[in-house]
Structures are given as C-alpha cells and as structure tokens.
Amino acid sequence: GTLITPENARKIKEAGVQRCSISIDGYNAEKHDAFRCVPGAFDATMRGIECLKAEGVEFQINTTVTRDNLHDFKKIFELCERIGAAAWHIFLLVPMGRAAELADQVITAQEYEDVLHWFYDFRKTTSMHLKATCAPHYYRIMRQRAREEGVSVTPATFGMDAMTRGCLGGTGFCFISHVGQVQPCGYLTLDCGNV
C-alpha cells in the first residue's frame, strides 16, 4: 500500500483490478513500522488505502501473526473494520525466505490454537471476509466449533471455508517466482518446472 498514489489507484481501477491486498501488521504506526522496519510505512499505507477508496477499489488487509502483534489482534481487527476493508487475511508466520530471520517471532502451538479460536469468533461479528492462510488447522477448529454450536458447515454458513480442506499448495494454487520457477507453494521449494 505504500506505493499507491492517486494516479496508481486510477490505473488499478482502469485495469479492472477488483481487490488489492495491503499488509498491516500493527494497529498503529509505532507497531506496524517496527515490524516492517520502515519508518512512515503505516502512514503511507493509510494514504494508499484512501487512494484506493477514492477510486472505489476494494482492499483487503493481510496481517502476519507474530509474537509482537499477537496480543493486539482485536485492535488490528477493529482497524480493518474502521477503515472499510472488504477482507482480513491472517498469515501464520512460516520462517522461510526473508521470514527465516523472524524465527523468534513464531508463536507457540497453544498460541496458534488461541488465535485461530479468536479468528473464528471474529467472523461471527463482521461482514468482512476472514481467511486464515498457512493455517490448515483453522479448518479443524472451524468444524469442531460449528459442531459444538449445532451449525452445519456449508457454503451458506461458511462460504468457501466450507470446501477448504487443509493446505491448498499444489492443489488449489501454485506459486510462480519472479524468475518463472513453478512451485506448489512459495514455502515449498519443490521445482515443478519453469514457465
């Protein structure tokens, strides 16, 4: 979102882009900028979002779950709602690639369970589309909680989540790198050819 200007937003709209993904990893400038290691990133992101909104382009917020922002999740959720995000996608930190340097930010197994239960509860309170990425265990939690609540897991009650069964890498999508290498997922460096 930091590079979106009024001109870029207009071009995005003219190109027919239906939704842009914007990363926000903290509910305020101090928290977000510290994670991104870029002073001013939060404010620039907010300006970019306003440019998209002015052009009528939907946006979703992507948030990486880390030790540093775990306890701020309700505040990040509230920020997403306040700024008018169409969706909030959380990404469980996979310490691969550049994220290998963030291994100390990986949360515990119990914290993952807790955050995914919170996420399940959040989805009941909002019209935003919520999606947990790199979190196949969310779908276990969703089914367990729905069963406890007497709710059938169908597309009518859970949308596309009703049809998702675990990791989609290599089955529901693939990753193509900047040099054309095809992989089942950006985190699984299995060479499947080159475009």
Task: Locate predicted features.
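A structural motif corresponding to the C-terminal lobe/cap of the Radical SAM core domain
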Residues: 82, 101-127, 189
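Accessory C-terminal segments flanking Radical SAM cores
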Residues: 95, 135-195
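Structured helix-beta-strand junction loops
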Residues: 15, 55, 125-126, 170
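Flexible glycine/acidic-rich beta-alpha junction loops that bind and position SAM and/or redox cofactors
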Residues: 68, 87-107, 129-147
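Residue-level preference for long, well-ordered alpha-helices that form the structural scaffold
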Residues: 38-41, 69, 104, 108-112, ...
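Glycine-rich, flexible loop/turn motifs
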Residues: 31, 38, 98, 103, ...
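Radical SAM/AdoMet-radical enzyme domain recognition
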Residues: 1-95
